[in-house]
A protein has these predicted regions:
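Formylglycine-dependent sulfatase
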Residues: 1-257
Length: 257
């Protein structure tokens, strides 16, 4: 089995296993201790859409068509997305008998035929682009005509402007359910967190618990989520035959933090 846990805008030094003195990440630290730290792990681009396209396809963004001089990332009103002729990790594994699930931020197209379920994923639950791309979350002039942020289940919008403080918890519940539901067959889970991209939100139980303010709270909730995924693998007897990779799309957006 394969599990990729993917964060948005997390910095190299935001984890205690990489030297952060105040943010506690015991579950991710355990992964680093029991597995390996990938210290020369390059992203395809320094922003979200092309980096994610590179991850999904194994191709440079300039070749998969999702990087250009005028627009670096897709927006809610973008008319394009990852092309149907691109071969994704999910598509290859699906064709070879794997159950495939995507949870969280996609950012490779906000509508069909560009959604995860159009690119080899059996199921999808999440927000199709960055959490600041709505007039509710972004007061910039460019966002005035953006639609409300949709929460999508497979190919259908089920909510508008979901409570972002509950996203990490809800994503985690879906990820754990996917693991349990497919514990008797090979699976690929792509779990792409919305955070710590700004604006920052965390569940009430994590507010004020870190020594690094709201940003630290958000990262520590993500670490809790990693622990829940690892626990689900262990409890279902999958921890010895599952590759788990924890990484991010690019470095931090320092001015926003």
């Amino acid at each position: 089995n394969f599990v990729i846990i993917f964060c948005d805008d997390m910095g190299y030094g935001d984890l205690s296993c990489y030297g952060n003195p105040t943010i506690r990440t015991p579950n991710i630290d355990r992964m680093a201790c029991e597995g390996m730290k990938l210290t020369q792990y390059y992203v395809g681009a320094g922003v979200s859409t092309p980096s994610r396209a590179a991850l999904m396809t194994g191709r440079l963004p300039v070749r998969n068509g999702l990087y250009g001089d005028r627009v670096a990332v897709l927006f809610p009103n973008s008319k394009a997305g990852l092309g149907q002729d691109e071969v994704t990790i999910a598509k290859v594994l699906q064709q070879n008998g794997y159950a495939t699930g995507c949870v969280g931020k996609w950012h490779l197209g906000a509508f069909s035929p560009y959604l995860p379920t159009d690119h080899g994923f059996d199921t999808y639950f999440g927000i199709p682009y960055s959490n600041d791309m709505s007039p509710v979350q972004n007061k910039g002039a460019h966002a005035r005509n953006f639609p409300s942020t949709p929460l999508i289940l497979d190919g259908k919008q089920i909510e508008s402007e979901p409570d972002q403080g509950e996203l990490t918890r809800r994503y985690t519940e879906k990820a754990v359910s996917f693991i349990k539901d497919h514990s008797k067959e090979p699976f690929f889970l792509y779990f792409a967190h919305t955070f710590p991209h700004i604006p920052l939100y965390t569940n009430a139980r994590f507010e004020g618990t870190s020594k690094r303010g709201l940003y630290g709270d958000v990262v520590e909730e993500i670490d809790w989520s990693v622990g829940e995924v690892l626990k689900a693998l262990r409890e279902n007897g999958l921890d010895e035959n599952t590759f788990v990779i924890f990484t991010r799309d690019n470095g931090p957006w320092l001015t926003g933090h």
